[in-house]
UniProtKB/Swiss-Prot annotation:
The chain crosses the membrane at residues 26-46, 112-132, 136-156. This is Uncharacterized protein HI_0219. GO terms for biological process: response to hypochlorite. Pfam families: DUF417. Its main location: membrane. The lineage of its organism: Bacteria, Pseudomonadati, Pseudomonadota, Gammaproteobacteria, Pasteurellales. It comes from Haemophilus influenzae (strain ATCC 51907 / DSM 11121 / KW20 / Rd).
Length: 213
């Protein structure tokens, strides 16, 4: 048994010696990963389907709802129940419904999406720039952290983040907290972005302080 443990420990030390000197490269990889996600998702905000697809987040968020004209308004549905107006004008991805698109134009959905997308792409660029410029990278990392906090708040403000109880032939056993829907499962991953942003920011902060020595 001692022989096996010795071999195992030797292997672990061998791997550690390879990985340890690459810490800076791995942190740069975090920056690249954050940039890819930010640039891709932020860039897609100019697309109609993506702008429509964030309406539930924006309408329910205290940070963003002011960007919409109608989305947060309460209106009666076909059953006479009061619901947020955006719920009556959802466009499934890949489906074009003219009356819904017109409503989103009047709502300011697309303008808001362009603004949000530009902010996301800018944060991604600043984070990536941390590879070469510590000050820009510090700003980008902290903004990534802050943006992740806002995104994670959608778990609290967005009803669609949790599996609903839609009924059926049998009782629904798993709905509400802690049962994340597809929307919620997408949002919860921003915890990784939060950690990555802080890691990138801390490395830039150390480089800035090192200049003073």
């Amino acid at each position: 048994m001692e022989i096996y443990m010795s071999v195992f420990n030797t292997f672990v030390e061998f791997v550690a010696r390879i990985v340890a000197p690459m810490q800076r490269q791995f942190i740069n990889f975090i920056r690249i990963a954050i940039f890819i996600v930010m640039a891709w998702i932020g860039g897609l905000k100019v697309c109609q389907y993506e702008a429509d697809g964030i309406a539930h987040f924006v309408s329910n968020s205290p940070f963003f709802s002011y960007m919409y004209e109608k989305g947060p308004n309460l209106v009666p549905n076909d059953k006479g129940e009061l619901v947020m107006e955006y719920t009556l004008h959802k466009n499934p991805e890949g489906k074009m419904v003219a009356k819904n698109i017109e409503w989103h134009k009047e709502n300011g959905t697309y303008t808001a999406s362009y603004i949000i997308g530009a902010i996301i792409v800018t944060v991604g660029i600043l984070t990536l720039a941390g590879i070469w410029n510590a000050t820009a990278g510090l700003a980008g990392g902290l903004l990534t952290f802050g943006m992740s906090i806002v995104t994670l708040s959608f778990l609290i403000t967005t009803p669609e983040a949790w599996v609903p109880n839609l009924g059926g032939d049998l009782p629904t056993p798993a709905y509400g907290f802690p049962y994340l829907s597809g929307v919620g499962r997408l949002v919860i991953k921003d915890i990784i972005m939060m950690a990555g942003g802080l890691t990138a920011a801390a490395e830039c902060a150390n480089r800035i302080l090192a200049r003073k020595k």
